[in-house]
Amino acid sequence: ACAATCGTVCYTSSAISSAQAAGYNLYSTNDDVSNYPHEYHNYEGFDFPVSGTYYEFPILKSGKVYTGSSPGADRVIFNDDDELAGVITHTGASGNNFVACT
């Protein structure tokens, strides 16, 4: 089952967890790959279920964990306590904005 759908891409909860874990591991060791994860400022004003400083990390439709190069359109958002805030995408958004995955 899809835990999040970004455009036509279905993400399982395990795929989301894997992306979040990889992103948070880099964040917690003050490391990054191709400038990810980086702080996500929520200019779009999403009503996330957790608070804190947010970070974005790519989630890939291939199911692989992001290790650099093209990040694609989709991002997992987590906070500095490693709590999942949501999954968002550039797909269907104008310019460099994001919309929520459903």
Swiss-Prot record:
Pfam name, any one: Ribonuclease
Catalytic activity: [RNA] containing guanosine + H2O = an [RNA fragment]-3'-guanosine-3'-phosphate + a 5'-hydroxy-ribonucleotide-3'-[RNA fragment]
Keywords carried by this UniProt record: Disulfide bond, Endonuclease, Hydrolase, Lyase, Nuclease
Signal peptide stretch: none
Gene3D superfamilies named among the record's database cross-references: Microbial ribonucleases (3.10.450.30)
EC number, as in UniProt: 4.6.1.24
Cited InterPro entries: N1-like, Ribonuclease/ribotoxin, Ribonuclease_N1/T1
Record bears the keyword Nuclease: yes
Active site as annotated: H38, E56, H90
Molecular function per GO: lyase activity; ribonuclease T1 activity; RNA binding; RNA endonuclease activity
Hydrolase keyword on record: yes
Family, per entry: Belongs to the ribonuclease N1/T1 family.
Protein name: Guanyl-specific ribonuclease Pb1
Organism this protein belongs to: Penicillium brevicompactum
The organism's taxonomic lineage, starting at the top: Eukaryota, Fungi, Dikarya, Ascomycota, Pezizomycotina
